[in-house]
Regions:
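Amphipathic, Lys/Arg-enriched alpha-helical "gate/interface" segment within cytosolic domains
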Residues: 1-126
Length: 126
């Protein structure tokens, strides 16, 4: 399951995966953020807040996740990954080579710093 919250007017999306991801998680996510992106052009930021990566429920969920990344990574200014997981903490180094977005890792204790960093990103103009 992927909990999500779109902070308005900042245009910051917060994602909190807490169970294996389903294809429906991404369908719900897209239906909420695509209208915002259509109106504003981009999201100012995306925060992934996770204790650990829960994986995918099945191959369909994996495909939906990859399609979401492919179709949205150029529409996000900054990505913060908030976690104490060693494995997830390494993802920004990998992601920097694959996506066109500023990526930064923050520990759990730096949650507010991560949010502040996202808010400092290029403001989205209507």
């Amino acid at each position: 399951m992927l909990k999500h919250q779109l902070l308005l007017p900042e245009g910051i999306l917060i994602l909190e995966p807490d169970a294996p991801l389903e294809a429906a998680d991404f369908e719900g996510l897209v239906s909420e953020i695509d209208p915002y992106i259509a109106e504003h052009g981009k999201l100012s930021g995306l925060m992934v807040h996770a204790k650990a990566f829960p994986g995918w429920a099945n191959l369909e969920a994996f495909r939906a996740h990859m399609q979401f990344i492919k179709s949205h990574h150029q529409k996000i200014v900054r990505l913060s990954l908030v976690t104490d997981s060693t494995l997830l903490g390494e993802l920004p180094k990998i992601a920097a080579h694959l996506v066109h977005v500023q990526v930064k890792h923050f520990s759990e204790s730096q949650h507010e710093d991560a949010l502040r960093w996202l808010k400092e990103g290029t403001p989205v103009s209507p």
